[in-house]
Structures are given as C-alpha cells and as structure tokens.
C-alpha cells in the first residue's frame, strides 16, 4: 500500500504532527512523550486540559491513543475526515481515532499480520462509541467484497442489537456496556471485510433483577414496550407502562431524556433482519424478553406451613405460553427444589425468600443464556461463506476489544473484582507487549537497549489466579466444600492462606490506623492502579450462580426453539459440577490474552472528563483518578525510558534540512549522511541523540523543541525570500504575457489597417474615375457611364438639404437643387413648410391660439391702414383691462347673468361741446355697454351697431355708429381708448363686425342727435392734440409714426 505524503487540514493547510509543536504553549503537545517533565502527573493532566479546552480530544503516548469524551458532536467523523486520514502516515496528521484505524489496517494489509485494537476506560468514557467509529471507518474506506456488502452491513448492524440486549443506563453513562466484547473482523487478501466473530465476557446479569436508584434495566425491555406494535404487545401479554413490571421499577428511572426507546426499537428491528433473523426467530426472541418481565411479576404467599405458593396465576399462564413449558411443572419448579440423594429424587418446598431467589435466578439464567445464544446467532451471520475455499488461508484478522476499565466504587463486589482482575491481566499484557515492541525497535535500529524499571503486576495477577493459593482457587474451594460455607468463612480462608502477601489486607490483618477504613466483611487489594476495597457479601452466591435442578429440567422441556438451544438436555445427564463463574471468567480471560498476544496490538485509552456528562467541563480529580487506574503515567514512563522522539531519516531531513546550508535546498547523498551533517550543524550533543539504521533517536523533548523553534524562525525568512522570488517571477511572467499579447495585437492591427487602407485607396480611385466620366456626360441622357454621377449629385443634394432645412416658418431659405431635382425640391419645400406649420400648430395652447386669431383679425383690419398698428403687434392682447373688483357691483347686478367678455377704461366725448368724460367700455355676448361709475349710461346691442369708424393716423379715437331709427339711442358714440387696436379687434369679433370697421383718411362724420351730424377732423402734427375747432368740429392732431 502506498503512503500519501501529506494531508490537508480543514483550512487547506498541510497539517503534520510537528507543525503543532509551535502552538504547544496554547494547545499542549500532541504526544505526551514530548512533555519535558514527563514524570509529573500534574503536567500530564495540564496538557490534557489544554487540548480539551481547544476541542482536541485525542493525544498520543507514542502509538497509544488517549481519548477524552467531549459529550457532544465535534463533526470530526465525517466522510471528509475519513479520506483525510486514509493512507496517510501516522505522524503526518493530528492525533485521531481514524489515524489509529488506518495505521492498523495498513499494517494488516502490508505485513499480513493479524492486528488488535484494545479499547479500555471506565463507563461513560466513550469505548462503545470508539468501537462504532472504527467499524464505520472500515465500512466506509475498505474495498467492498466481491459478493456485495452484506458482511459489512451485518458488522455495523450487530452493534445496535448487542447494545439493546447488553447495554443499560447507569449513574455514569446513559448507554453503558454491561459486558465485555471482543470482535474479530476478517479481511480477504484485497483488504475487504468478509467475515467476523464476537466473544462476550461477564454479562452483568444481576441487572435483570436489580438496579440501583437512577439506573435502568437493559435497553431492550424499554424499547419493546415503547416501540412494539399494539398487536405484538397484546400477543405477548404486555402493556406499555414500564411501571407495571417489578424488574423495571427498582431504579425509578424508566424515562430518560437522552434516550429515544421508540426510534431505537425501529433500528433494532431493522438490524435483526439484516443479520438474518427470520420472523419466527424474532417472535421467539421477543417471547423470551416478555417472559423475563412476566417472571418478575410472579408473586408468592406463604401457606400454613410457611411454604411459598404462586399467587399470580395470570402471569404464570403467560409464562407457560411464552416459554413453551407446562404450567404445573413451572409452578412446582418455582416453589420446590429437587434434591438427589443416594439415587433418590426428593422435592423440598421453598419458603418465600428461597422462592424469590429461585425466580430471580431463573430470570437471570434465561436472559444471560439468551444473550449468549444471540451472540452465537450473530456469529453465524458474520461467518465467512468462503471458509472452505483455498483463498481462505490468505485472510487476516483485525480484533476490536471493548472491555470495561478499572472500576472503583463506593461499594465494590464480585463484579468489580472480576473486572479489575481483567484489567490487571490486560495491563500485564500491555506492559509486556510495549516493552517488547520498544526493545525490538531498538534492536532493529542497532541502538543499545537500556533496561526499563517498571512495576511488574505479575505478583497481583498471581495473587488472584494462582492455583491452590490464589483468591479464585480459594473462592472455588469454599464454594465446593461441604458444610455451611458463607462469605465470611471465605474471608477467613483468605486471611489464613494469603495473610503475608504484600498486596492483600483485611480488617484483621491491618494495623490500628488502617482498620478504621476497613469493615470486617471487606478485604483490600493493592492493584497496579491503586487500592480497592471489596465487600465479600455475595461472593459465594455470585460465583456459584446456582440454578435449581428442577428449574433446569423445566427449561430443557421448553418448546421455544431458542430456549431449547439455551438449556441443553445434556446438562441434566452431566453429573460433573459446573465450573464457577470466576473460573469460567479466568479461563476465558486467559484465552483472550492468548488471542491478543498472537496479534499486533494497538491501544486506545478512553477518559471521562466529568460525571455530569456535560460538554466542556474538565473535572481534574476524576481525570487524575482515571489516569492512575489506566496506568497512563506508567505507560509514558516506559515509553520515555529511552528516547522521546524517533523519525525516519528521510522525514527528519525533509523537515529540518533548511536549517543547514549544506543540506539546503537539496541533499544529494544518503539521507542518513544528510541527517548527520544537519545535527552537527545544529550542535546536538552526543548524549542527546543516537543514529540508528533507518531512524534518528532524540532523547530529550527540549532538543526537539529547540530545533522546532529554529525552524519556525527559518521559515519566516524562507517565506519572505519565497514571496519575493515568487512575486518577481509572477510579475515577470505577467509582463512577458502582456508583451507577447501586445506584439500579437499590434501585428494584427497593423495588418488590418494596411488592408483597410489599400481597399480604401482602390475604392477611391474607382469612385474618382466614375465621377469624372459621369461629370463629362452629365448633360447626356442617363446611361451606365453617368448614372453613378447623377445618383451622387442627387444623394449629395438630399444629404445637404437634410442639414440645411429651414428652422421655422419665417425662414424662406432653401438650397438650390440640381436641374433633375427641381420639381422634387419644390414638392419637398412645400411638404417641409406644411410640416413646420403643423408642428407649430400642435404645440400652441388654446390661449395662445385665441391670441393669434385676434392678432390675425387685427392684421386683416389695420395692417397698412392705421399708423399705430405696427406698435401694437408685439404687445399681447389682454383678456380684460379691468378686474371684477374695478366694476361696480350695481353694474354687475344690472347685467344679471350676462358675462363680461372684455372691459377697458375709455374716454367719451359729448356730442355737444365734445367734453371728455371717463367711462368703462364693457363687451358682453350681445351688447356694448358704456358705464359711468355705478350706472349703465348706454347699451348698444350688436344688432343696432352699424359700424365703427377710426382714422388712419396714430390717434386712439373711434366712433360707434348706431341705427338712427333706434329711439333708445341718442346718436353715435365718440370714444378714446389707450388700447384702440385691441379694443376695436375684440369689439369687431364680439359684434361680428370685422368687415364694418371703416378707416378714414381726413374726417369722420357721426350722428350727433336727431337731425344733427357731427364731424371729426384729423390732421398730422408733431404731437397728439384733441380740441374743439372754431368751425364746431372736433379737431384731432396726431403725429405720423409710419409713412405709407
């Protein structure tokens, strides 16, 4: 398998183990071996704290991975993370569970040696989760087997089934494994998983009948009640409320917020189908689970002889159906004990206490044997189907050990004794294999092996397991001997047999001071991890694990197929006393040690940061306790007994070669020689390092840290140089690219311009020749020779005309057209003028239109006829010269509803004497009204207005002629207005007398009264003068403004 040289971090930066050394003050070191004060437990824990604070939950002790449970999802187990760690050297990436998984897998593939990953730690430290993550990694990253992914799916789906039947909520962990598990995963020669096998150890079956306050029974009971279908529960005789079952209420913790039993049951049901459970097998399995609940609800009452009698007939009825046994047989087995004496079978009745004991013993036996059957069933499902093929021999095995860690509680009993004995054996194996691995590496590298002083816990293992004199042997002997054996007699036997052992102590053997901390029913062992005090109460009973013979006989007759396999009839004919629980556990543990010894080990030590299961909380007391019991300091001390750091020459030279001028930038010789030159330049002292065959060994972390600090400084310098070189290169390349592009563009553009210029010259020459020929023949009829010229002349005229069109209707300019376009030019001129007029007319407002119409009428009447007309042209006509407020209300009242269209102040001349008088001239729709102050002096209807006379001079007099026959009128009216042109134009329009305005040259005759006429004489002079002449005429002298 090929290595990938590097890996990318989440930010895209290459991350290696050494790259984090520069941040060691903030996040700690990634390998405890690099701790300067490696013997200090405080320094060890402080390094853990720093990393935990930064969400770095993994740290190495050499090849051993220490994991701290974060109690929250850190999003570090995604497919992206798996790819990041797959195929990468162990020290090329930060510490991670996947790094260990990949290293183990690559060793399995390349070295063809069986591997084992040992996961240990106390409950709630994350062992089960680590096992699941390892299986997930192998399922996602390993190649798929040729026959599909069935085995891979079964490996993954075996977990939820085993968790349902073997895990429970405890005070320390909501999903605590209550059994030890060792799983072998078989891989073919291609590295694909093809099979598996599971071994289970020491299921905590006492939990079936008893739970401490705040704890639960095994998950499967609650999952079935919460998630089972109504029909299934009815068939099993169950109801959903867990409070209805004695075995589920003792912990008083049926509901847990962090556990969803309903959804978990769906996962379990799906998993059962994946691992080849038939519907009948599922039904039989659920019947057994339900029978345990019903068994817990069996109650007894004492008869007159104090013998126990079953009082819950309904529960007994369900039990007989679910377990497939006879009701009377089961009743008798629960209330009597069968004794065989001298070949005779005797039934001894049980009292209430003994009956309850028998009931609970049956419940524990049924559940524990069902669990063992379940493991065997899963193993059959995981077994490789190619075991008989020749390629089977090429398979390799990877073992996963999820075992309970060292346990020290307030009250420690038989279970803790077995668990801690197991940890002693594993610690013994761990130290042995670690020292062996260290020694083999030293020898392979040609480095002298320095003997390591360490605590050999063989003395404790012998104390527990030695034949005849060990605790287990003494316990078995006490269980087997005739007579009244009790837990206290067992303790006395221990005191007599091993009283001189330095690691054993009881109340009787202790000094006065120590006795205060030991009860008379306790003994204390000094384990490798510290002292543990055990209570002997229940040791004999739990070791015997006694199930009365008639209960076995009853279960052997079961028609439930699973029960029939769990209780084999051969047990009844076997007269040999069954092995005790402790002996069985010792034998299985010795077998496990041999299995692990045959494999290449890897270690994962799990630590729980606090008891409250809260993220971000670091309980130093609790962690110090676990560091001690996991033997991590001892592990570190063994690892650091020689050299703290070792790396291949190639990797060391590649990382640090920039620190030496001779090795930078390229070393062409052997890597070993390059490293020798490098360390001499760095000033390493002989006692600080050793040169092996393929690796350099550095004794002290401070030597490595000094080198790393120098590298960080050197990197800054190199980074500056690289940046400068890169910028120079980058801008040079950019300049050259721009230059090449510019030359290319210039070349192309010059060619284009040249071609355009040549084409233009050719076109110009042809055009000039055609124009000259056309000009010569311009007067000839149209022909091919002059057509281009004529068209050019016409086009030029039209284009020039477009630029020289008249600006307005008064502009009469127009370009001179060529002879051929004269007619067209006139038509265009007419169209242009019409268009300008039309546009102008569309643009004027109604008010302006009225103004123009009045001006047009004034022009028609006065233009060229009256001297002062030109002065009135630029002056706008006003709609009225008097406002409403200037006209008397009495006048307005006299006019009634008639609107005033125009009003102007005038001067009226009397008919006799020509005396001037101020008046107002009002025009209505039907009459001319002359007003004096508040009185209407004269009203002239338009029908009686026969004409209007005015002189041709610049004066402002005019005469309104009325019909002589009108009796209402006294005669014509002589008036003077400063706005004579405006007044006469509006009067003529209102009275429809445009054609009745007379412009006289010398005099005007008007009717002065009945039978009398008056005359107004007009003469020109230097200034305006109006007087009565001696001849009785009205003489008007007016200056001449325009010569006509």
Curated annotation (Swiss-Prot):
<dbReference type="GO" id="GO:0031941">
    <property type="term" value="C:filamentous actin"/>
</dbReference>
<dbReference type="GO" id="GO:0005634">
    <property type="term" value="C:nucleus"/>
</dbReference>
<keyword id="KW-0009">Actin-binding</keyword>
<dbReference type="GO" id="GO:0030048">
    <property type="term" value="P:actin filament-based movement"/>
</dbReference>
<dbReference type="GO" id="GO:0045121">
    <property type="term" value="C:membrane raft"/>
</dbReference>
<dbReference type="GO" id="GO:0071346">
    <property type="term" value="P:cellular response to type II interferon"/>
</dbReference>
<keyword id="KW-0112">Calmodulin-binding</keyword>
<keyword id="KW-0539">Nucleus</keyword>
<dbReference type="GO" id="GO:0032421">
    <property type="term" value="C:stereocilium bundle"/>
</dbReference>
<feature type="modified residue" description="N6-acetyllysine">
    <location>
        <position position="467"/>
    </location>
</feature>
<dbReference type="GO" id="GO:0005903">
    <property type="term" value="C:brush border"/>
</dbReference>
<keyword id="KW-0813">Transport</keyword>
<dbReference type="GO" id="GO:0005102">
    <property type="term" value="F:signaling receptor binding"/>
</dbReference>
<dbReference type="Pfam" id="PF06017">
    <property type="entry name" value="Myosin_TH1"/>
</dbReference>
<dbReference type="InterPro" id="IPR036072">
    <property type="entry name" value="MYSc_Myo1"/>
</dbReference>
<keyword id="KW-0677">Repeat</keyword>
<dbReference type="GO" id="GO:0005737">
    <property type="term" value="C:cytoplasm"/>
</dbReference>
<comment type="subunit">
    <text>Interacts (via its IQ motifs) with CABP1 and CIB1; the interaction with CABP1 and CIB1 is calcium-dependent. Interacts (via tail domain) with PLEKHB1 (via PH domain); the interaction is not affected by the presence or absence of calcium and CALM. Interacts with POLR1A. Interacts with POLR2A. Component of the B-WICH complex, at least composed of SMARCA5/SNF2H, BAZ1B/WSTF, SF3B1, DEK, MYO1C, ERCC6, MYBBP1A and DDX21. Interacts (via its IQ motifs) with CALM; this precludes interaction with YWHAB. Interacts with YWHAB; this precludes interaction with CALM. Interacts with RPS6.</text>
</comment>
<dbReference type="GO" id="GO:0030659">
    <property type="term" value="C:cytoplasmic vesicle membrane"/>
</dbReference>
<dbReference type="GO" id="GO:0060171">
    <property type="term" value="C:stereocilium membrane"/>
</dbReference>
<keyword id="KW-0518">Myosin</keyword>
<dbReference type="InterPro" id="IPR000048">
    <property type="entry name" value="IQ_motif_EF-hand-BS"/>
</dbReference>
<feature type="domain" description="IQ 1">
    <location>
        <begin position="715"/>
        <end position="744"/>
    </location>
</feature>
<dbReference type="GO" id="GO:0030838">
    <property type="term" value="P:positive regulation of actin filament polymerization"/>
</dbReference>
<dbReference type="GO" id="GO:2000810">
    <property type="term" value="P:regulation of bicellular tight junction assembly"/>
</dbReference>
<feature type="domain" description="Myosin motor">
    <location>
        <begin position="28"/>
        <end position="712"/>
    </location>
</feature>
<protein>
    <recommendedName>
        <fullName>Unconventional myosin-Ic</fullName>
    </recommendedName>
</protein>
<dbReference type="GO" id="GO:0005886">
    <property type="term" value="C:plasma membrane"/>
</dbReference>
<dbReference type="InterPro" id="IPR010926">
    <property type="entry name" value="Myosin_TH1"/>
</dbReference>
<feature type="domain" description="TH1">
    <location>
        <begin position="866"/>
        <end position="1040"/>
    </location>
</feature>
<keyword id="KW-0963">Cytoplasm</keyword>
<keyword id="KW-0653">Protein transport</keyword>
<keyword id="KW-0007">Acetylation</keyword>
<keyword id="KW-1003">Cell membrane</keyword>
<dbReference type="GO" id="GO:0032587">
    <property type="term" value="C:ruffle membrane"/>
</dbReference>
<keyword id="KW-0505">Motor protein</keyword>
<dbReference type="Pfam" id="PF00612">
    <property type="entry name" value="IQ"/>
</dbReference>
<keyword id="KW-0966">Cell projection</keyword>
<dbReference type="GO" id="GO:0000146">
    <property type="term" value="F:microfilament motor activity"/>
</dbReference>
<feature type="modified residue" description="Phosphoserine">
    <location>
        <position position="517"/>
    </location>
</feature>
<keyword id="KW-0472">Membrane</keyword>
<dbReference type="GO" id="GO:0006612">
    <property type="term" value="P:protein targeting to membrane"/>
</dbReference>
């Amino acid at each position: 398998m090929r290595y990938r040289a590097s890996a990318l971090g989440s930010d895209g930066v290459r991350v290696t183990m050494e790259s984090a050394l520069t941040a060691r003050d903030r996040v700690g070191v990634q390998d405890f071996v690099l701790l300067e004060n490696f013997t200090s437990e405080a320094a060890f824990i402080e390094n853990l704290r720093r990393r935990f604070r930064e969400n770095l939950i993994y740290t190495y002790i050499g090849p051993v991975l220490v994991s701290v449970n974060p109690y929250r999802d850190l999003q570090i187990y995604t497919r992206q993370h798996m790819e990041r760690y797959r195929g990468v050297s162990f020290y090329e990436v930060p510490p991670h569970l996947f790094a260990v998984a990949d290293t183990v897998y690559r060793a399995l593939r390349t070295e063809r040696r069986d591997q084992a990953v040992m996961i240990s730690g106390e409950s709630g430290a994350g062992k089960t989760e680590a096992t699941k993550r390892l299986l997930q990694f192998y399922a996602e990253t390993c190649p798929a087997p040729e026959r599909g992914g069935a085995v891979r799916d079964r490996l993954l789906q075996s977990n939820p089934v085993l968790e349902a039947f073997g895990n429970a909520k405890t005070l320390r962990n909501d999903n605590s494994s209550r059994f030890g598990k060792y799983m072998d995963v078989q891989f073919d020669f291609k590295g694909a998983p093809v099979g598996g096998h599971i071994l289970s150890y020491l299921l905590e079956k006492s939990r079936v009948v008893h739970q401490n306050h705040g704890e639960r029974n095994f998950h499967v009971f609650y999952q079935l009640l919460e998630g089972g279908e109504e029909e299934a529960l009815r068939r099993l005789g169950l109801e959903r409320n867990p409070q209805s079952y004695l075995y589920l209420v003792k912990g008083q913790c049926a509901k847990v917020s962090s556990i969803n039993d309903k959804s978990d049951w769906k996962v379990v049901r799906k998993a059962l189908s994946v691992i080849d459970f038939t519907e009948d097998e599922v039904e039989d399995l659920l019947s057994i689970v339900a029978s345990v609940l019903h068994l817990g609800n069996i109650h007894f009452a004492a008869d007159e002889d104090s013998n126990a009698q079953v009082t819950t007939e309904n529960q007994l009825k369900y039990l007989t159906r679910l377990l497939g046994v006879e009701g009377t047989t089961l009743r008798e087995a629960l209330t009597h004990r069968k004794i065989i004496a001298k070949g005779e079978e005797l039934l001894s009745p049980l009292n209430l206490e003994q009956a309850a004991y028998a009931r609970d013993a049956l419940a524990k036996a049924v559940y524990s044997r069902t669990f063992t059957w379940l493991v065997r069933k899963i193993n059959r499902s995981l077994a490789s189907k190619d075991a008989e093929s020749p390629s089977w021999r090429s398979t390799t095995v990877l073992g996963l050990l999820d075992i309970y860690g060292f346990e020290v509680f307030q009250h420690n009993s038989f279970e803790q004794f077995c668990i801690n004995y197991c940890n002693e054996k594993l610690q013994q194996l761990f130290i042995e294999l670690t020292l062996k691995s260290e020694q083999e590496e030293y020898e392979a590298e040609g480095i002298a092996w320095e003997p390591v002083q360490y605590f050999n816990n063989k003395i404790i293992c012998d104390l527990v397991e030695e034949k005849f004199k060990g605790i287990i042997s003494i316990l078995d002997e006490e269980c087997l001997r005739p007579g009244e054996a009790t837990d206290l007699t067992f303790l006395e036997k221990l005191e007599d047999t091993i009283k001189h052992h330095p690691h054993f102590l009881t109340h009787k053997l202790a000094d006065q001071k120590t006795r205060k901390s030991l009860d008379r029913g306790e003994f204390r062992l000094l384990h490798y991890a510290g002292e543990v005090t055990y209570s002997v109460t229940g040791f004999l009973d739990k070791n015997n694990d006694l199930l009365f013979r008639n209960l076995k006989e009853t279960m052997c007759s079961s028609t439930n197929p699973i029960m029939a396999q769990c209780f084999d009839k051969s047990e009844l004919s076997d007269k040999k006393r069954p092995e005790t629980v402790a002996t069985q556990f010792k034998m299985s543990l010795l077998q496990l040690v041999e299995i692990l010894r045959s494999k290449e080990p890897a270690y994962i030590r799990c630590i729980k940061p606090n008891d409250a299961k809260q993220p971000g909380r670091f309980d130093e007391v609790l962690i110090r306790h676990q560091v001690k019991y996991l033997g991590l300091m001892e592990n570190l001390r063994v690892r650091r007994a020689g050299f703290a750091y070792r790396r291949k020459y190639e990797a060391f030279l590649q990382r640090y070669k920039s620190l030496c001028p001779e090795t930078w930038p390229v070393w062409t010789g052997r890597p070993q020689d390059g490293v020798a030159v490098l360390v001499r330049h760095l000033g390493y002292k002989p006692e600080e390092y050793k040169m092996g065959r393929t690796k350099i060994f550095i004794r002290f972390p401070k030597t490595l840290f000094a080198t790393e600090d120098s590298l960080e400084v050197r990197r800054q310098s190199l980074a500056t140089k690289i940046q400068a070189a890169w910028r120079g290169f980058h801008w040079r390349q950019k300049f050259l690219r721009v230059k090449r592009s510019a030359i290319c563009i210039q070349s192309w553009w010059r060619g284009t311009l040249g071609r355009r210029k040549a084409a233009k010259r050719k076109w110009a020459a042809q055009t000039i020749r055609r124009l000259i020929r056309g000009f010569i023949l311009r007067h000839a009829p149209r022909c091919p020779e002059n057509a281009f010229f004529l068209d050019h002349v016409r086009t030029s005229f039209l284009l020039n005309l477009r630029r020289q069109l008249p600006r307005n209707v008064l502009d009469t300019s127009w370009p001179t057209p060529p002879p051929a376009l004269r007619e067209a030019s006139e038509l265009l001129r007419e169209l242009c003028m019409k268009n300008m007029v039309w546009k102008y007319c569309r643009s004027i407002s109604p008010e302006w239109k009225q103004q123009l119409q009045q001006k047009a009428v004034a022009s028609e009447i006065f233009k060229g006829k009256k001297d002062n007309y030109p002065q009135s042209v630029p002056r706008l006509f006003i709609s009225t010269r008097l406002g409403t407020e200037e006209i008397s209300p009495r006048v307005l009242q006299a006019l009634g509803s008639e609107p005033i269209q125009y009003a102007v102040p005038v001067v009226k001349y009397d008919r006799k004497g020509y005396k001037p008088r101020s008046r107002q001239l009002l025009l209505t729709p039907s009459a001319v009204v002359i007003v004096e102050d508040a009185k209407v002096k004269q009203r002239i209807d338009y029908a009686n207005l026969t004409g209007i006379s005015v002189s041709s001079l610049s004066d402002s007099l005019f005469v309104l002629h009325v019909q002589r026959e009108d009796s209402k009128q006294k005669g014509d009216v002589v008036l003077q207005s400063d706005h004579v042109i405006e007044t006469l134009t509006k009067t003529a329009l209102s009275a429809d007398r445009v054609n009745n305005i007379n412009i006289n040259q010398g005099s005007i005759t008007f009717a002065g009264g009945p039978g009398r006429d008056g005359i107004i004489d007009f003469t020109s002079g230097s200034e305006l003068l109006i007087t009565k002449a001696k001849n009785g005429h009205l003489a008007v002298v007016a200056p001449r403004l325009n010569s006509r």
